[in-house]
């Protein structure tokens, strides 16, 4: 176990020898000591982090905005809430994050924008959980994330919730075939990106996925979501126009309330079949405030509309 005084001794002797913590708790103590001495803009590159596997909440709700650009994070597997609620907006573009499995809430509510170090070339191919990763970011993202390899990710819930992304932002080519959960992924976000070629074969939960995200204009006609189970408010108040979704299979879905609220549908869905477990009320609410010709409604709904 590292002696916390090692850093203090090195400072007094002006040694350039790096401190090498083995555990997250030791790393936290060193960071705390340095920030107390030199303030939140201090340089922490004197810390050798090559043995650290867990960086969860390392700078959560911190004023830190110093230099950690040279950190070796090659063994880190967990970066949950690492910068959540923090003021950090430094350069971490050259980090090797290839072994990280969890990035849940990593930049949630933070000041990070990627302006001073684009993280678009990060190797995130092993990350399985990106839940709330950029949710509620304080400032618009300045990085594109275009080159991210997301083929291992299963959870993208709240990922860009209430986030504004810059003009360079482009996730159109992301591999999302393993994503199972995308609830509120783009809820109330400001993102203009074409997701028409996304393959969502594994998607199970998509409640509020695009709710109030009214900057999207892409066509979902190519989408196929055979495993979709719940999609309440999925496109509610997004303003998306649906040109042709006749081929969508909704027969296994049990959550459809307000799915197309405030949208426009320009295709005939009369042959759609609902799950026998769905109540009439749920079926009917699927198209609440939706602009769709009466004859285009699913046949199972038409009698319900007439009753009302």
Language model feature labels by segment:
Residues 1-308:
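Negatively charged
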């Amino acid at each position: 176990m590292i002696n916390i005084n090692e850093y203090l001794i090195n400072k007094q002797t002006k040694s350039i020898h790096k401190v090498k913590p083995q555990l997250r708790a030791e790393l936290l103590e060193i960071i705390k000591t340095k920030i107390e001495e030199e303030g939140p803009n201090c340089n922490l590159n004197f810390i050798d982090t090559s043995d650290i596997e867990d960086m969860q909440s390392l700078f959560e709700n911190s004023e830190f905005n110093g230099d950690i650009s040279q950190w070796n994070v090659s063994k880190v597997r967990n970066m949950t809430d690492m910068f959540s609620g923090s003021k950090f907006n430094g350069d971490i573009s050259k980090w090797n994050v290839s072994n990280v499995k969890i990035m849940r809430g990593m930049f949630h509510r933070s000041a990070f924008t990627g302006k001073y170090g684009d993280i678009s070339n990060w190797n995130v191919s092993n990350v399985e959980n990106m839940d709330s990763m950029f949710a509620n970011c304080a400032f618009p993202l300045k990085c594109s994330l275009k080159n991210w390899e997301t083929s291992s990710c299963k959870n993208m819930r709240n990922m860009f919730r209430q986030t504004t992304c810059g003009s360079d932002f482009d996730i159109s080519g992301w591999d999302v075939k393993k994503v199972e959960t995308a609830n509120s992924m783009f809820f109330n976000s400001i993102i203009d990106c074409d997701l028409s070629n996304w393959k969502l074969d594994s998607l199970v939960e998509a409640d509020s996925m695009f709710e109030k995200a009214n900057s999207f204009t892409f066509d979902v006609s190519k989408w196929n979501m055979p495993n979709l189970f719940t999609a309440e408010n999925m496109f509610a108040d997004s303003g998306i126009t649906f040109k042709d979704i006749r081929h969508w299979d909704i027969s296994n879905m049990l959550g459809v309330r307000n799915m197309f609220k405030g949208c426009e549908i320009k295709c005939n869905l009369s042959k759609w079949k609902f799950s026998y477990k769905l109540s009439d009320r749920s079926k009917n609410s699927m198209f609440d405030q939706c602009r769709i010709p009466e004859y285009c409604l699913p046949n199972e709904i038409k009698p319900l509309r007439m009753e009302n």
